[in-house]
Structure formats: structure tokens, C-alpha cells
A protein has these predicted regions:
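Functionally engaged cysteine thiol sites
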Residues: 31, 36, 57-59, 121
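Short N-terminal segments immediately surrounding and downstream of signal-peptide cleavage
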Residues: 25-43
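Bacterial N-terminal signal peptides
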Residues: 8-19
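Signal peptide processing junction and immediate N-terminal pro/mature segment
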Residues: 21-23
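A short, solvent-exposed beta-edge/loop patch
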Residues: 25-26, 32, 95-159
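Sec/Tat-exported extracytoplasmic proteins
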Residues: 35, 43-47, 63, 155-159
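Positively charged n-region of N-terminal signal peptides that target proteins for export
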Residues: 1-8
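Short, solvent-exposed recognition patches
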Residues: 45-118
Length: 159
């Protein structure tokens, strides 16, 4: 009887592990979402190959004072990426501006610090159950919005 319980528990654990792996495999690796030529075309500069920032679901490219980051949102603190998106879209913080963005994904918004571009300009995109952010640095705000939107449209095609 004890061995049947151990076998059953092992099977359940195996199936649970497999489901975690398959759902993790559904999330693109950050550096595979955008290519060096796509980044270079959008920014107008030659950029380094993409490198993960802190996790495989993030990536950064840079060159000539321009930086592009891509971050694919993951579940966090019991909230799905879509829940995080909806919360961030509604949240107001002093000095931080969010603006709706159209024409990319199912829903999107820009996020930036008012009156400066030191912290870059992000475009947070929801497509289906996926959420990602393209953030650009080294551009004035109008340029940053154009560059981030160009790259976000290309990234959205991978989700």
C-alpha cells in the first residue's frame, strides 16, 4: 500500500513538473524576440548583440548612447502578467506619466518620467495573456515613443 502511494505521488509530481516546463517553454526567451538588425533599423545606430539583463525573459541591446531593453512579464506575487498590466495602467505616481498607445497588441500604454528622458520611455504591451515592455534610452520623448512603438509592433508578432 505504501509503495502505491509513493508511485502515485511520484506520478503527480512528474506531471506537475512537466506542466511547469511546458508553460515556461511557451514564454519566448527575451533575446529571441527582437533581432540586432531590427534594433539597429529602429534606433538608427549599430547595436551590440542582445544580452539577458537579469533573467532569460529580458534582453538589452546598446550602441552609440542608445539602449533598448525588452522585458517579458512573468507571474509575480500571485498576479498574472495581465493583472500586473491592468494595475500598472491604472496606477498614478507623482512625476510618472502613463499614456494610452494604440496600434500595437491588444492594449498598450507608454510610461515615462515627466520632463525628462534619463529613465527612458517604456511601451508596455498586452497581447493575449502575454505582457512585455520595450524601453528605450538616449532619445527625446517624441523619438522614444516612435522607436519603442516600432520595436513593440515587431515584438508583438512573436506572441
Amino acid at each position: 500500500m505504501r509503495s502505491i502511494g509513493l508511485i502515485s505521488a511520484s506520478i503527480v509530481l512528474f506531471l506537475f513538473s512537466f506542466s511547469l516546463l511546458s508553460s515556461a517553454a511557451d514564454v519566448p526567451v527575451g533575446c529571441s524576440v527582437l533581432t540586432q538588425p531590427q534594433i539597429a533599423a529602429a534606433t538608427g545606430v549599430t547595436v551590440s548583440p542582445g544580452a539577458p539583463i537579469s533573467a532569460p525573459t529580458s534582453c538589452q541591446w546598446s550602441g552609440s548612447g542608445k539602449i533598448v531593453t525588452l522585458t517579458i512579464r512573468q507571474p509575480l506575487a500571485g498576479k498574472s502578467p495581465v493583472d500586473q498590466f491592468n494595475d500598472a495602467k491604472k496606477k498614478t505616481l507623482p512625476g510618472i506619466t502613463t499614456e494610452p498607445a494604440s496600434g500595437v497588441g491588444d492594449d498598450a500604454f507608454y510610461i515615462f518620467y515627466a520632463g525628462q528622458n534619463r529613465a527612458g520611455c517604456g511601451l508596455v504591451v498586452k497581447k493575449g495573456t502575454s505582457v512585455f515592455e520595450v524601453r528605450v534610452y538616449g532619445f527625446d520623448l517624441a523619438q522614444a515613443k516612435t522607436v519603442s512603438k516600432t520595436l513593440a509592433k515587431e515584438a508583438a508578432a512573436k506572441f
